[in-house]
């Protein structure tokens, strides 16, 4: 892996330049497969060059930021690749975002244009009134759209008119920004994490060499391409190493193995929820008719790990841990059930990653009498941190566009005076052998349906809807569900909250995965001396009506309403008879 990075550094190569070498090597090899169409490396190169020349002719230059907002498709890749060839930095926006979250994602990086898919025109229209601070913002649409709805220019016309020759007016640098990937981080609205060419190369090389991916391997990912998982970890194998890759616009559990067979995939990608959905499908012959030799990803729970491997005959699992923006990353290459990676206990100080003790209530690092952090012993949960070395592309931390957000993720004087480390915001545990296991998130962010949910964002939205009433949002565990389901506790002694209005406004303002599934109505909410509302005890109590005496409600999606949650309902949710 390091040899690959050194080679790229010597050549000062960009992602686009590496891809062009692959095109010359095998122009007619299948590059990306989507639905029933196969794109060759030459076709991807030509289309991305047309994108580059199109936007260069329109006046976009190196350093300009442009939002890319569309569902997963081949053009999503060719557009960001093409823009990068002229130094324009694409902001890859979550296609589930709406209204304020969408507008914030666009304005936070001062985008000069929005490239959107015709399938998302309504979302763009709804967010447009919130984008007034961006003067002269231009809109470009790929696919069908009504100019009366959005005054956009058609890329279906502009791109084919452009030259397929490589753009000649820009020479990039591997330390340039390649694109932005949005992450909720630990608090607040979505943050734009900076992905440089060097980081894309490092992440891709890590997956490639640690999983021993060969030239003949074919990948399949059904994960969204705006995410690091699908958009970098899988597609980097295609763009940097020449592997063919099949993609899907939206994940389908019933079609997963059909796609693997169709594309003749040998490697597939997962997240924990995806594995559970696939496992819940009725058994069928296709379960073992595929050629998959490796599945890699994150979040495969120990409780279903062996069952998944046995039923679908998967020889190898590459469970990994990492974050979009961080430098603290590990991978399990030993098929150790439940482990996300390994860290030697023999000489822990030479490792660039570590576990440090944190306060269970505040999440703050615990320091010794020298003012330094304390490493965890085996069995102790601690926050995973990565040592920052600015001169090393593997160990540097580029952070976010927002510098204040970046500073919050850096801890100083971690193990020696003057050093710096990246705070992952996650609790891990190491066993006696050195294997690492994911425990929980330390901050307010929790994961549901494969997405990070920022409690601060949801709390802010609820506060506005309820005219600034006190509320806290947190994640609660639900049996046989990955991640945590959102729950809100609202201070409402007089029970004036209209849950119908609340739900209607939340559906309009938040992505579906961020809408709380449980509601608790409290007389008061306990606060700290600095007026911060406490949620640790609320989270521990979960949504169990035998423990909680406050009124409880759950979201019945069939009826589209919050309904009372009693003991029978609770048991039905826990047993899976009621699906969230």
Q: Which positions does each model-derived feature cover?
A:
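AMP-binding/adenylate-forming catalytic domain of the ANL superfamily
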Residues: 142, 510-533, 549-577
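Conserved AMP-binding/adenylate-forming core of the ANL superfamily
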Residues: 7-20, 28-73, 77-81, 98-107, ...
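Conserved pre-ATP/AMP-binding loop-to-beta segment of ANL
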Residues: 27, 141, 146-147, 160-182, ...
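Structural core segment of the AMP-binding/adenylate-forming
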Residues: 53, 57-58, 81, 85-160, ...
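Conserved AMP-binding A3 loop
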Residues: 40-42, 171, 178-202
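Conserved AMP-binding/adenylation subdomain of ANL enzymes
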Residues: 201-218, 226-266, 281
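AMP-binding/adenylate-forming catalytic core of the ANL superfamily
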Residues: 97, 104, 114-116, 322, ...
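Gly/Ser/Thr-rich phosphate-binding loop
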Residues: 240, 257, 262-270, 279-359, ...
């Amino acid at each position: 892996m390091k040899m690959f990075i050194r080679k790229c550094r010597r050549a000062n190569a960009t992602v686009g330049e590496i891809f062009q070498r692959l095109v010359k090597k095998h122009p007619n090899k299948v590059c990306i497969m989507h639905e029933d169409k196969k794109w060759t490396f030459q076709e991807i190169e030509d289309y991305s060059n047309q994108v580059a020349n199109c936007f260069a002719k329109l006046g976009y230059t190196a350093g300009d930021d442009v939002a890319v907002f569309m569902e997963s498709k081949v053009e999503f890749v060719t557009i960001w690749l093409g823009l990068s060839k002229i130094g324009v930095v694409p902001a890859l926006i979550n296609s589930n975002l709406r209204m304020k979250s969408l507008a914030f994602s666009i304005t936070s990086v001062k985008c000069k244009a929005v490239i959107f898919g015709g399938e998302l025109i309504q979302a763009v229209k709804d967010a447009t009134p919130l984008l007034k601070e961006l003067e002269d913002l231009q809109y470009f649409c790929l696919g069908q759209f009504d100019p009366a709805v959005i005054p956009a220019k058609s890329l279906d016309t502009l791109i084919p008119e452009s030259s397929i020759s490589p753009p000649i007016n820009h020479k990039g640098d591997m330390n340039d920004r390649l694109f932005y990937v949005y992450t909720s981080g630990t608090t607040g609205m979505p943050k734009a994490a900076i992905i440089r060419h060097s980081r894309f190369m490092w992440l891709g090389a890590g997956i490639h060499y640690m999983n021993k991916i060969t030239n003949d391997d074919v990948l399949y990912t059904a994960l969204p391409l705006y995410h690091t998982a699908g958009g970098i970890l899988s597609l980097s194998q295609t763009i940097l190493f020449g592997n063919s890759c099949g993609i899907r616009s939206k994940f389908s559990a019933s079609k997963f193995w059909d796609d693997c067979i169709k594309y003749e995939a040998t490697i597939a990608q997962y997240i924990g929820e995806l594995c559970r959905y696939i496992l819940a499908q009725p058994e069928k012959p296709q379960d073992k008719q595929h050629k998959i030799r490796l599945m890699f990803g994150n979040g495969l729970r120990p409780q279903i790990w062996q069952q998944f491997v046995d039923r679908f005959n998967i020889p190898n699992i590459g469970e990994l841990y990492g974050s979009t923006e961080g430098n603290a990353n590990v991978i399990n290459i030993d098929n150790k059930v439940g482990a996300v990676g390994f860290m030697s206990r023999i000489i822990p100080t030479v490792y660039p990653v570590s576990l440090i003790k944190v306060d269970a209530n505040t999440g703050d690092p615990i320091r010794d009498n020298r003012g330094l952090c304390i490493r965890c012993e085996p069995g102790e949960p601690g926050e995973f941190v990565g040592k920052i070395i600015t001169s090393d592309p593997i160990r540097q931390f580029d952070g976010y566009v927002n510098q204040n957000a970046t500073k919050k993720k850096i801890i100083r004087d971690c193990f020696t005076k003057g050093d710096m480390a990246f705070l992952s915001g996650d609790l891990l545990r190491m066993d006696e052998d050195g294997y690492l296991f994911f425990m929980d998130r330390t901050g307010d962010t929790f994961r549901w349906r494969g997405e990070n949910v920022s409690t601060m964002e949801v709390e802010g939205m609820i506060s506005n809807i309820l005219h600034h009433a006190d509320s806290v949002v947190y994640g609660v565990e639900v049996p046989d569900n990955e991640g945590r389901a959102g729950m809100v506790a609202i201070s409402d002694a007089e029970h004036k909250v209209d849950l119908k209005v609340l739900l209607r406004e939340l559906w309009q303002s938040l992505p579906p995965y961020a809408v709380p599934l449980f509601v608790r109505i409290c007389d008061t909410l306990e606060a700290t001396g600095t007026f911060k509302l406490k949620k640790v005890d609320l989270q521990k109590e979960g949504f169990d009506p035998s423990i909680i005496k406050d009124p409880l409600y759950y979201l019945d999606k069939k009826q589209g309403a919050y309904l009372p949650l009693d003991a029978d309902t609770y048991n039905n949710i826990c047993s899976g008879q009621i699906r969230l």
